[in-house]
Amino acid sequence: MIKLLFMGTPQFSATVLKGLLDNPAYEILGVVTQPDRAVGRKKDIKVTPVKQLALEHGISIYQPEKLSGSQELIEIMGLGADGIITAAFGQFLPTILLDSVSFAINVHASLLPKYRGGAPIHYAIMNGDKEAGVTIMEMIKEMDAGDMVAKASTPILETDNVGTLFEKLAIIGRDLLLDSLPAYLSGELKPIPQDHSQATFSPNISPEHEKLDWTMSNQEVFNHIRGMNPWPVAHTFLEGQRLKIYEAQLAEGEGLPGQVIVKTKKSLVIATGQGALSLIVVQPAGKPKMSIIDFLNGIGRKLEVGDIIGR
């Protein structure tokens, strides 16, 4: 039985971890995940999906704010793991930790060397890519630059958003890891170096990324909305208040960027730099998420054709 240390945080990671837990060839000695966070207006403490799964299986849990130089680092290095598996962990691994095990493998949600970094799925959708994928790669000091063990891809559909693509890629990543790990550990599967000249990056999403730019084409704004749903959610401004936009549809029409060009009891169409978008699901400041019909029956009823949002 191969003894593993698992490191990850979101549901993507938990899906991969569950695959390892269900496989008798592997023993998970401990998991390392991000600290619990206070979320929402009530500041409720939320544990990570990886922690929740580890609790259900009685696995030791480590949650350092920063792994490097921590007491937790000393403890996990003393567990005697053969190797490390990471999947969307969210922190760099100290070289001393990588050197302490026989192998260290990362499940990364992109087709490397494209989209190294922390938000590959967001960028794949926002950039209008036709496919996304997962790469199993060796971990080295440089971020997501290690040799590639295996790759698998899937089409990005017009109906996909970050949430749906995360779910698809988590399953692909789990299966790809379980399929390739035995051959990799036996030496039968030889890793392939990345072409570093082709590397692109997907830095973590900042608040500035969330703001919609209505001067872009309707396809670009549409992709941006999908690439922010369900988190952190794209937004524009209505009378100085933030208006989150969860869903929209491509529409025809012309007008100034951000201008209301169609308003009925059931629809609100906004012009973009090229074409237009029909808003479907929105969330006004201080209100719950709602359909555009409910919005137009409430706060949105004051909007008129010719008004401009986003200012």
From Swiss-Prot:
Question: Which Pfam families does the UniProt entry name for this protein?
Answer: Formyl_trans_C (PF02911), Formyl_trans_N (PF00551)
**Single GO MF descriptor:** methionyl-tRNA formyltransferase activity
* EC number of the protein: 2.1.2.9
Q: Which InterPro entries match?
A: Fmt (IPR005794), Formyl_trans_C (IPR005793), Formyl_trans_C_sf (IPR037022), Formyl_transf_N (IPR002376), Formyl_transf_N_sf (IPR036477), Formyl_transferase-like_C_sf (IPR011034), GART_AS (IPR001555), Met-tRNA-FMT_C (IPR044135)
List positions binding (6S)-5,6,7,8-tetrahydrofolate. Answer: S110, L111, L112, P113
| PROSITE patterns documented for this protein | GART
User: Per the record's keyword annotation, is Acetylation included, yes or no?
Assistant: no
Which reactions is this enzyme annotated as catalysing? L-methionyl-tRNA(fMet) + (6R)-10-formyltetrahydrofolate = N-formyl-L-methionyl-tRNA(fMet) + (6S)-5,6,7,8-tetrahydrofolate + H(+)
One GO CC term, this protein: cytosol
Asked if the Swiss-Prot or TrEMBL record annotates the protein with the keyword Transferase, the reply is yes
* Keywords, ordered alphabetically: Protein biosynthesis, Transferase
Q: Which family does it belong to?
A: Belongs to the Fmt family.
PANTHER family in alphabetical order: METHIONYL-TRNA FORMYLTRANSFERASE (PTHR11138), METHIONYL-TRNA FORMYLTRANSFERASE, MITOCHONDRIAL (PTHR11138:SF5)
Query: Which protein, by its recorded name, is this?
Result: Methionyl-tRNA formyltransferase
Q: What is the species of this protein?
A: Streptococcus pyogenes serotype M49 (strain NZ131)
Q: Print the organism lineage.
A: Bacteria, Bacillati, Bacillota, Bacilli, Lactobacillales
